[in-house]
């Protein structure tokens, strides 16, 4: 449902050139390629293993309109202009938003739009960013509009944190049910005790996210969508 909502709010249409910044394991890039077969979808990730996974999934699904570029976003330069640029949970890991938005503005076609999905906090003290997103941040709702130039926010939406709280609870339950297999997968690359420690850390992370995003009916920590 969130993938479809992302496409709707981004104003994606078949035949567009779509660039996803920080595509992760390809959920949105693959979904967009499947649902908009006349579009060209380019994902950017700093992980070669993510690129291999996405391209493998594309082959299995018979999708020939997906490309993945492995690059650090601080050094990335887009291959041409795009009708839509989409970023889902990447801006939290970037520091100089003004410079990033300036660069993105140069990657958009004349009628192009940027869609940003980002975690945010009601307050601007970044408490959660300091304690749970080391190296990243938890911006306040008005940060992006303040630094958007040369772009400007056309429309914005708030998704209550309760949705992400339920997602975190589901991830936690899934990890509990598959803890043995997950630990085995990590054992080898990691010593056995470190593998178990990593599983416990993920359990704590999911529980923390569920509690924090569910706090105060999801009004304190939440998700924001912006179209620029």
Residues of each region from the PLM?
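Conserved alpha-helix/loop element of class I SAM-dependent methyltransferases that forms part
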Residues: 1-16
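Conserved class I S-adenosyl-L-methionine
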Residues: 15-24
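Conserved SAM-binding loop
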Residues: 54-55
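A short acidic, Gly/Pro-enriched loop at the edge of an enzyme's catalytic core
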Residues: 74-85
């Amino acid at each position: 449902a969130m993938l479809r909502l992302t496409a709707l709010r981004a104003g994606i249409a078949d035949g567009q050139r779509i660039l996803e910044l920080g595509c992760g394991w390809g959920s949105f890039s693959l979904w967009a390629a499947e649902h908009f077969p006349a579009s060209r979808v380019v994902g950017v990730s700093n992980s070669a293993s993510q690129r291999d996974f996405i391209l493998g999934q594309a082959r299995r699904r018979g999708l020939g309109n997906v490309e993945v570029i492995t690059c650090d976003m601080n050094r990335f330069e887009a291959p041409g202009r795009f009708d839509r640029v989409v970023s889902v949970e990447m801006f939290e890991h970037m520091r100089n938003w003004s410079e990033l938005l300036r660069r993105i503005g140069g990657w958009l076609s004349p009628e192009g739009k940027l869609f940003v999905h980002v975690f945010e906090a009601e307050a601007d003290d970044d408490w959660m960013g300091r304690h749970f997103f080391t190296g990243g941040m938890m911006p306040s709702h008005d940060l992006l509009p303040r630094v958007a130039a040369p772009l400007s926010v056309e429309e914005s939406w708030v998704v209550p944190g309760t949705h992400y709280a339920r997602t975190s609870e589901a991830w936690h339950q899934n990890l509990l049910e598959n803890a043995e297999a997950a630990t085995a997968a990590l054992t080898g690359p990691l010593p056995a005790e470190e593998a178990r420690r990593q599983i416990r850390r993920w359990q704590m992370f999911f529980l923390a996210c569920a509690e924090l995003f569910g706090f105060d009916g999801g009004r304190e920590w939440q998700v924001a969508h912006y179209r620029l």
